[in-house]
Amino acid sequence: MEPGAAELYDQALLGILQHVGNVQDFLRVLFGFLYRKTDFYRLLRHPSDRMGFPPGAAQALVLQVFKTFDHMARQDDEKRRQELEEKIRRKEEEEAKTVSAAAAEKEPVPVPVQEIEIDSTTELGGRQEVEKVQPPGPVKEMAHGSLEAEAPGAVAGAAEVPREPPVLPRIQEQFQKNPDSYNGAVRENYTWSQDYTDLEVRVPVPKHVVKGKQVSVALSSSSIRVAMLEENGERVLMEGKLTHKINTESSLWSLEPGKCVLVNLSKVGEYWWNAILEGEEPIDIDKINKERSMATVDEEEQAVLDRLTFDYHQKLQGKPQSHELKVHEMLKKGWDAEGSPFRGQRFDPAMFNISPGAVQF
């Protein structure tokens, strides 16, 4: 499975998890499905067995998958720890810079130096000392000018505060990491995601909104309106014109008490939306996952997938695949037929080399 492909099924799995309410029952559902619908629990005891796993192989497979994601979880823990340490280090550095800048502002300005020039002359037989004192005014002005030139820099240094990261993610890579915005986006008052046939919109509500009668949802083929009922009227949470048509008959909504209004919109056509509402910032649909979910596969496509799965197991065990078995069955019917030159001989499938393209299913 390609990296990120498992996220395709998040919406379906989240629905199961919300229904059963806990991880233990969720795992029971998953393994119960494997028990009822697959050969996961069937053991290969004889060489003639065509389905199942060797003893212990299924358990080893589960353990291997568990260890894979356990390793990823430990890596995530380490990454979070490093990010926290880096955040603390940066905060300490910023605080140190702020303290230094504040201390620089409080340093006393040095007293202007007075320059005294002594001129000695011999006049009338005596020595006369003339003291010329340079007026302190210009010096003071220069000193103040120097201070005024430096002060803005010091204030700017003290005012340098790290910018807060934006509250909402802005790039599609961030949206893809969140199941609620997978193939969609996070907006100010709602979050939306989509697959090949449906869209899911989550509109947050206050914690005290726990009953369906406390909200109002109006859906038409081209618009949506979600409001919360209050004592003095309605408070609109989301309203606008849809960018594409929806099928209102198969669209529905529900309330997750104290969390959000969950609206499932059924697309009229099988194409990807770049926005829910007109005027909304569009997403880049070239950066979303356009693979179809298994939930959207019809019966005919499902039969093909089942056959491919069967062929995969057969190939691993060195046994005939579905196209070979079909030809073997036809050959075996005519092997002992009246007039057949092979009548009475043992039928050996190994005598035939059958290419997959030679068989029509």
Curated annotation (Swiss-Prot):
One Pfam family it belongs to: CS
Residues bearing the modification Phosphoserine: 146, 340, 355
All residue ranges annotated as the CS domain in the record: 185-277
Disulfide bond positions: none
Annotated spans, Disordered: 87-106
Lipid metabolism listed as a keyword: no
Keyword Phosphoprotein set for record: yes
Biological processes, Gene Ontology terms: cilium assembly; protein folding; protein localization to pericentriolar material
Biased amino acid composition, Basic and acidic residues: 87-97
GO cellular component: cytoplasm; cytoplasmic dynein complex
Keywords of the record: Phosphoprotein
GO MF annotation, one: unfolded protein binding
PANTHER family cross-referenced by the UniProt entry: NUCLEAR MOVEMENT PROTEIN NUDC, NUDC DOMAIN-CONTAINING PROTEIN 3
Protein name: NudC domain-containing protein 3
Organism: Pongo abelii (Sumatran orangutan)
Organism lineage: Eukaryota, Metazoa, Chordata, Craniata, Vertebrata
GN (gene name): NUDCD3
